[in-house]
């Protein structure tokens, strides 16, 4: 099922992302860059691992993991998290935990586009990606 996500994706639309970053505690300058950056996300399967590469003019990140297994992740805004990515039906669910806090991203494919819903507490952001 991960195969449905394996592609190169370009951000096309973003809703409430500034409020989401603010809730996470991301500083003003980093939020300004985050709001205008249009990252490319490359999702691939390499052997039994899933790899998610995020490339932008701001910062490049890469995570490699086994589905359902916890791993250490350093985010683009330099949070050190314990993360787990798993499949829930046709959704790819990514949970990050740090300092007693938790956020999650749910990626799903709708009409050939990848929709990513980011939730932290009661703040929800939605980012839309199209195949590059």
UniProtKB/Swiss-Prot annotation:
GO terms for biological process: fatty acid transport. It comes from the Eukaryota. CDD domains: FABP7. The keyword Transmembrane does not apply. Disulfide bonds: none annotated. It is found in: Cytoplasm. One of its GO terms (molecular function) is fatty acid binding. GO terms for cellular component: cytosol; nucleus. FABPs are thought to play a role in the intracellular transport of long-chain fatty acids and their acyl-CoA esters. Binds oleic and palmitic acids but not palmitoyl CoA. Forms a beta-barrel structure that accommodates hydrophobic ligands in its interior. Belongs to the calycin superfamily. Fatty-acid binding protein (FABP) family. This is Fatty acid-binding protein, brain. The lineage of its organism: Eukaryota, Metazoa, Chordata, Craniata, Vertebrata.
């Amino acid at each position: 099922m991960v195969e449905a996500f394996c592609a190169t994706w370009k951000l096309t639309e973003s809703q409430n992302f500034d409020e989401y970053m603010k809730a996470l505690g991301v500083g003003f300058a980093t939020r300004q860059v985050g709001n205008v950056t249009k990252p490319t996300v490359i999702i691939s399967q390499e052997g039994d691992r899933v790899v998610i590469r995020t490339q932008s003019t701001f910062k490049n990140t890469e995570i490699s993991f086994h589905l359902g297994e916890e791993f250490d992740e350093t985010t683009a805004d330099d949070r050190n998290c314990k993360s787990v990515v798993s499949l829930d039906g046709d959704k790819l669910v990514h949970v990050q935990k740090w300092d007693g806090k938790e956020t999650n991203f749910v990626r799903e494919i709708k009409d050939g586009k990848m929709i990513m819903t980011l939730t932290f507490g009661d703040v929800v952001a939605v980012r839309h990606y199209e195949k590059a």
